[in-house]
UniProtKB/Swiss-Prot annotation:
Basic and acidic residues: bias regions: 7-23
PANTHER family xrefs: RNA POLYMERASE II TRANSCRIPTIONAL COACTIVATOR
GO CC annotations, alphabetized: nucleus
Protein name (database record): RNA polymerase II transcriptional coactivator KIWI
Source lineage: Eukaryota, Viridiplantae, Streptophyta, Embryophyta, Tracheophyta
Family, per entry: Belongs to the transcriptional coactivator PC4 family.
Localization, UniProt: Nucleus
Physiological role: General coactivator that functions cooperatively with TAFs and mediates functional interactions between upstream activators and the general transcriptional machinery. Binds single-stranded DNA.
Predominant subcellular localization, coarse grouping: nucleus
UniProt keyword terms in alphabetical order: Activator, DNA-binding, Nucleus, Transcription, Transcription regulation
MF term (GO), any: transcription coactivator activity
Highest taxon, organism lineage: Eukaryota
One BP term from GO: positive regulation of transcription initiation by RNA polymerase II
Region named Disordered: 1-40
Length: 107
């Protein structure tokens, strides 16, 4: 007899011996952790649904420019937006004059 058939027979006998049936484990929802939001510093609201904030996430500081939406009375971040590292923010800030010049050239 092959080991494959033998193992199957053992499994059948083992399940016959068990008088209890085990229900799958229930998933327990994690409690909402607002500690991430407490690290957010809202710098300004750009429009009704857009804001700039500085936050600490995974031990790093990020400048977050993002759209938000309201669900069940809570304001939540949406997918549309960008999170800049401090280095990226400094690069953008150093080019602010170039951006202003390009805006004035197009106006």
């Amino acid at each position: 007899m092959s080991s494959r058939g033998k193992r199957k027979d053992e499994d059948v006998r083992a399940s016959d011996d068990e008088s209890e049936t085990h229900a799958p484990a229930k998933k327990v929802a994690k409690p909402a952790d607002d500690s991430d939001q407490s690290d957010d510093i809202v710098v300004c609201n750009i429009s009704k649904n857009r804001r700039v904030s500085v936050r600490n996430w995974n031990g790093k500081i990020w400048i977050d420019i993002r759209e938000f939406y309201v669900k069940d009375g809570k304001t939540l971040p949406g997918k549309k937006g960008i999170s800049l590292s401090v280095d990226q923010w400094n690069t953008l800030r150093n080019h602010a004059e170039d951006i202003e010049k390009a805006l004035s050239d197009l106006s």
